[in-house]
Amino acid sequence: MVASSSSATASLLDQLFALTPLADSSAWIKTITVLVLLPLLAVVLNVASQLLLATPKNHPPVVFHFVPVIGSAIYYGIDPYKFFFECREKYGDVFTFVLLGRKITVALGPKGSNLVFNAKHQQVTAEDAYTHLTTPVFGKEVVYDVPNAVFMEQKKFVKVGLSIENFRVYVPQIVDEVREYIKSDARFSALKTRKTITVDIFQAMSELIILTASRTLQGKEVRQGLDKSFAQLYHDLDSGFTPINFVIPNLPLPSNFKRDRAQKKMSQFYQDIVAKRRAAGASTSADDASGENDMIAALIEQKYKNGRALSGVEIAHMMIALLMAGQHTSSATSSWAFLRLASRPEIIEELYEEQLNVYSDGHGGLRELDYETQKTSVPLLDAVVKETLRLHPPLHSIMRYVKSDLAVPPTLSSPTSTKSEPDAHYVIPKGHYIMAAPGVSQVDPQIWKSSDQFDPHRWLDATTAAAMQDSGEDKQDFGFGMISTGANSPYLPFGAGRHRCIGEQFAYLQIGVILATFVRIFKWHLDSKFPDPDYQSMVVLPSKNGCAIVLTPRAESLHLD
């Protein structure tokens, strides 16, 4: 059978090369020639089709690319923002590019974001875009593995746990974790023998974010487990949260095998916690008899509209989703905030003065941080976090799958509009993916003065785009409470519409308290030049070789003992 197949292949090669100078060459030479020429032929045909075959008039223009299937993947992957800005200059705010066989239509600007985030669920869905990435990590029966109406109910349940009452408890817990980390971590212990230390701030923030999140949202069992097996489970599960699994899911990779094993073990870990708490009756409220103010305590109490309580599996997988989604984004944002402040040490001193003015105890010292003051009385600290998110939104691209042809409003793009056809517009075909990139608007020089500069004070000036970005927002209840639908804003670091991040307030609280605690204890500056962004992971991180900052304790800093 093999011999017959080889003979047929050789015969075919002989026919192909019969009229060429390679007619008398060996089969191996002919085979190699074919392997070289076929890709070249594919490139030629791909280029010819783009030059000779016109794109339908009502379809967005397609970004020119040489290699079929791969398309613009390399160009986009190296620097998405450079890709977006250059394509906008050439094609406008709406254009399509090929990404590893998928057709991605990009809609830029505030109106483009509004199109993506507020399109009807019957036309575009997030679950069809992301479930193959998230479900193996989060688990079944939650988030994008369930119908959208169920997911909206689950978001409502999580929102219950993100209450002001819980936030009041979380502030001192976060402070305690930060101070304990500085006391016990080996890198900081070097301060006992020298005046300054150099710290990889991304590594430190990755550790602090999970420590503070586990102490507050995740619960005491998770916090205790961070020093044991849970930390390894998290690492293995996290290894499956990679771009390759978004593009080509379920490859037989060692990292995916580890991911799947870790998901089962972590799921069982949480299910055991839920079972023990329910057995002990520790599920009455956020201030129940066990004194728990974490998310598990809140979820145990919740019921769907049909009266069914959440199962242990659902709670376990919602907790995993909460852990994984918040860890990456907050680690990145807090790291960028520290690095941006390190590039402007004078702002660190302004933050310290703000702490002295707001938290003075009247005797030359500082009161402990509290929720009410953090929420209402530290405008510069809030502005630092907002400005960091403006320049460094964690996600550079947000996608939806187009289920049915989607009309682009004429106000966004009208390639065929005439006096006789004033309403003509692009139509994004079914089967495309539609992509928003809010970060483009957030650094657009047509919107922001000195758009590439880190200037928290822009948020304190009532006349700037920054100060006005939150005004006049429409609100809608998608099933988990009233939220802003204001996707027309040029500032959308947490998204908009039905899939807007519900952890926004906790993120501001967590990052703000960590920053304030460090500002009270340290001054810092960059160890080298400001790092470039690294676009190779799921969120935009600072490049590994530029994360070092130099910390110097304040002479008047609080004692950590």
Curated annotation (Swiss-Prot):
GO cellular component, one term: cortical endoplasmic reticulum
Main location: membrane
Protein name per its UniProtKB record: Lanosterol 14-alpha demethylase
Gene name linked to the record: ERG11
CDD domains noted in UniProt: CYP51-like
E.C. code: 1.14.14.154
Required cofactor(s): heme
Residues given in the record as heme binding sites: C501
Claim: Oxidoreductase is one of the keywords in the record: yes
Localization (cell): Membrane
Cited SUPFAM superfamilies: Cytochrome P450
Record family assignment: Belongs to the cytochrome P450 family.
Enzyme class: oxidoreductase
Matching Pfam families: p450
Pathway(s) the chain acts in: Steroid biosynthesis; zymosterol biosynthesis; zymosterol from lanosterol: step 1/6
UniProt catalytic activity: a 14alpha-methyl steroid + 3 reduced [NADPH--hemoprotein reductase] + 3 O2 = a Delta(14) steroid + formate + 3 oxidized [NADPH--hemoprotein reductase] + 4 H2O + 4 H(+); a 14alpha-methyl steroid + reduced [NADPH--hemoprotein reductase] + O2 = a 14alpha-hydroxymethyl steroid + oxidized [NADPH--hemoprotein reductase] + H2O + H(+); a 14alpha-hydroxymethyl steroid + reduced [NADPH--hemoprotein reductase] + O2 = a 14alpha-formyl steroid + oxidized [NADPH--hemoprotein reductase] + 2 H2O + H(+); a 14alpha-formyl steroid + reduced [NADPH--hemoprotein reductase] + O2 = a Delta(14) steroid + formate + oxidized [NADPH--hemoprotein reductase] + H2O + 2 H(+)
GO BP of this protein: ergosterol biosynthetic process
